[in-house]
Amino acid sequence: MKIKTILTPVTCALLISFSAHAANADNYKNVINRTGAPQYMKDYDYDDHQRFNPFFDLGAWHGHLLPDGPNTMGGFPGVALLTEEYINFMASNFDRLTVWQDGKKVDFTLEAYSIPGALVQKLTAKDVQVEMTLRFATPRTSLLETKITSNKPLDLVWDGELLEKLEAKEGKPLSDKTIAGEYPDYQRKISATRDGLKVTFGKVRATWDLLTSGESEYQVHKSLPVQTEINGNRFTSKAHINGSTTLYTTYSHLLTAQEVSKEQMQIRDILARPAFYLTASQQRWEEYLKKGLTNPDATPEQTRVAVKAIETLNGNWRSPGGAVKFNTVTPSVTGRWFSGNQTWPWDTWKQAFAMAHFNPDIAKENIRAVFSWQIQPGDSVRPQDVGFVPDLIAWNLSPERGGDGGNWNERNTKPSLAAWSVMEVYNVTQDKTWVAEMYPKLVAYHDWWLRNRDHNGNGVPEYGATRDKAHNTESGEMLFTVKKGDKEETQSGLNNYARVVEKGQYDSLEIPAQVAASWESGRDDAAVFGFIDKEQLDKYVANGGKRSDWTVKFAENRSQDGTLLGYSLLQESVDQASYMYSDNHYLAEMATILGKPEEAKRYRQLAQQLADYINTCMFDPTTQFYYDVRIEDKPLANGCAGKPIVERGKGPEGWSPLFNGAATQANADAVVKVMLDPKEFNTFVPLGTAALTNPAFGADIYWRGRVWVDQFWFGLKGMERYGYRDDALKLADTFFRHAKGLTADGPIQENYNPLTGAQQGAPNFSWSAAHLYMLYNDFFRKQ
C-alpha cells in the first residue's frame, strides 16, 4: 500500500530552509580538530595510532593538517603519506609560505579552520591579506588556492624540511632512532622541477611499518615560476609578485611509476582550470550534506556529530590501489593497523549501510571491493572455499597469492550481514541492477557458510577457521601450543588436543583456530569464545567454577569426498544464527525483486527455521538471556545441538535476536530487562561488550567490556523493534552525554570505557561513525 503525503507550502518552506542550512559547509567549522605539526614519522598517541587528524578526501593517499600556531602558519603541516598499508608523516612544515615586503617579513595574524571538504587559512596584516583554501581535486592530488591582496610588490618564500626523527608516543620520543637509520633504503630525496619540486622515495618492504615501491613520489607544482634551492632534506622556493595575485599549487602522492605518469595530465588540467576543480569539490560536499542531513528533528549537537561521521567516513575512503581495484573504505586512516586501503567485510557492511545515504557510489564500491576477492571455483590457493569472502584485503597480496603483504588475511571471514547492507543501498537508490549484480555473490557467500561452517548440518552455522598454514599442518592436523611454566610446546591434531584438555596439565593453551574463530565473529577474544584473563579465571575457579567451562572444542569440517574444508568451534553462536536469519530474509526480498519467487519462498522458510531454533535452543529461561549453544555428541531430545553456554556470561550477542527480529516478544521483554539493569549492561556508557556480571569483564578489555558503537546501536534498534523505543532513547542520550569527546572536536573513537566514558582504541573510526550517523538519520527522528 502506498501512502501519499501532502505537504503544505509552509511545511515545504521549512524543509527547504532546513535542507539549505544543513548543506552549507560553512556552518560546520572545526567539527574535527585538524591542527597539528608532527615531529616524528610515527607521531603516535597512547595507543600507537597517529595522534593528529589530517584531512583526506576523494580517496586520496595523502592528507594535510592545519597549522597549530605561528611556526606553522602559511603551510598545511605534516603531510601524511599512505605508504600502501600504513600512514607515516613526511614533514612538519612542507611548502610553508612566508611573505616579505620591502625586505621585512610580514607579521600576520592567523585564522585557520576546517569545513567539510576544505582547509582554510586567513593571514591578515595591515597592508597584506592572504587567504588559502585547500581542497582535493583528484584521488591523488590536492589543490591549494592562495589569494594575496596587496597594493605593493611582495617576495614570496616557501620552505620545507623532511622529518628526521622516527617515533614518539604522546610527544615523547620512544628512541633516538632516525628515519634514515631505521630504513636506510628509503633514500628520500628532494629535487627541483620545472614548476616546483618532488620528493622521491627508495624501495622499502618493511612488512609491518613502511611499504614503498621505489617508484613513489610526492610532487608539488605551482602556477607561477619559482626559484628553488635544495640543501639536503630542506628546500626554499622564491617568487616575486607586483601586487595582488591568486596562485595555485598542487600536491600529489603517487605510489607507482604508472601513477606518476598518469597523473601529470591531470595536474596540468588542474592548474589550467583550478576554479573548475575547486567548485566541483565544493558542490560535491554540498551534495553530501544535502543528502545526508535530512533530519529536522535532530538537535544541533546531534547534527554536528552526523557531520563528523560524514567527514570521518569520507576521510577513510581510499581510491583503487594495488590489489584492491575498487574504491574502498578503511576502518581508520590514522589507525596503526587500519590504514592504507586495508578492507574488512564486517566494517564494510556497516560503512556502506550509512554511506548509502550520502555517498551511495562509494557505498557500492566498498562492497564491490570486498566481493572482488570472493573465492571462485578453481581458485589456486583455496579451491575448497568457493563463495568465501576473505577477512582482510589490502594493497599487497599474501605470499600465497604472489605478494609480500603481511596484513592480507584468509584465515576467516566475517558475520553474514552483507545482504543487510546491500539491501540498504537498494532501499536508498532503488537501483535494481545493483541487486542483480550482488545477488549471486550473496547466494554464494550464504552457501559457503552452510557448506563450510555447519558441522552438524542443522542449518545453524558456527564460527570457525579456514584450512590455513596458521591453523594446521600440511597434512591437515590442527595446531595448538601448550604452555606450562616457562615451557611451551606446539602440538597438532584434534585427538592430541582432546587428550591435553582431559589431562589438564597446562597453564594455558594457544590455539590459532580459536583466535580466527573469534575474528570471524567480529568480536575478537570475546568471553563467549573462551577468552578470559588468568586472574579472572583463577577467581572464577575459586568461586566454584570449572576451568573446563572456558575450554573450547573444535571439529573438522570435510566435504563428501573427505577434503578438509576448515574448522568449526563446537558451539552455535546466537549472533551468527540471528544474522543468518536476516540474511535469509534479505535474500528473499532480493529474489522477489528479481522475479525468483521459488527462491524467495525457500529463503523465507530457512529464516523461520532459524527463528524457531534460536528461541527454542538459545534462550535460557533461568537467566532470561540468549547465549551460544554447545554442540554435544548427540542432539538433545528437543532437537537442540546442546544447552546454552550460560557460564561464560552475558554479552551483546544476547540482543542480536532482537536487532535481527528473530526473538519472540516474551524473550525480547526479558532481554531488555537485562539490558536496562545497572548491574548488567546499563553502565555510565551503556551496552558494553560484556555484562558487569560476566567473569571475563574488564572495562578496558577490547571485546569483554568496552562499548562498541555497532553493538550499542544493534541494542537500541533491537529495543525499538520490540516496543522499547523510549528506553532506548534514554540510553542513546546517556551515550551522547557520557562518551568523552563525542560532541566536542575530538575524532570519533573505536570504542569507549563503559565505566568512565574514556575514549579507547583507534581515532577516526569508520564503523563508529557509521552507527552514529545511523542514530542521527533514523533513530533520532520523531515517530
From Swiss-Prot:
Leader sequence segment: 1-22
Residue numbers spanned by region N-terminal domain: 24-254
Binding-site residues for Ca(2+), renumbered to this chain: D454, N456, N458, V460, E462, E572
GO molecular function: alpha,alpha-trehalase activity; glucosidase activity; metal ion binding
Alphabetical UniProt keywords: Calcium, Glycosidase, Hydrolase, Metal-binding, Signal
Ranges where the record places region A domain: 300-783
Keyword Acetylation part of the UniProt annotation: no
InterPro entries tied to this protein: 6-hairpin_glycosidase_sf (IPR008928), 6hp_glycosidase-like_sf (IPR012341), Glyco_hydro_37 (IPR001661), MGH1-like_GH (IPR054491), YgjK_N (IPR048450)
EC number: 3.2.1.-
One annotated GO biological process: trehalose catabolic process
Residue positions of the active site: D524 (proton donor), E750 (proton acceptor)
Linker as annotated region, ranges: 254-299
Cross-referenced SUPFAM superfamilies: Six-hairpin glycosidases (SSF48208)
GO cellular component, one term: glucosidase complex
Superkingdom classification of source: Bacteria
Function: Glucoside hydrolase that cleaves the alpha-1,3-glucosidic linkage in nigerose. Has very low activity towards maltooligosaccharides, soluble starch, nigerotriose, kojibiose and trehalose.
Family note: Belongs to the glycosyl hydrolase 63 family.
Protein known as: Glucosidase YgjK
Organism: Escherichia coli (strain K12)
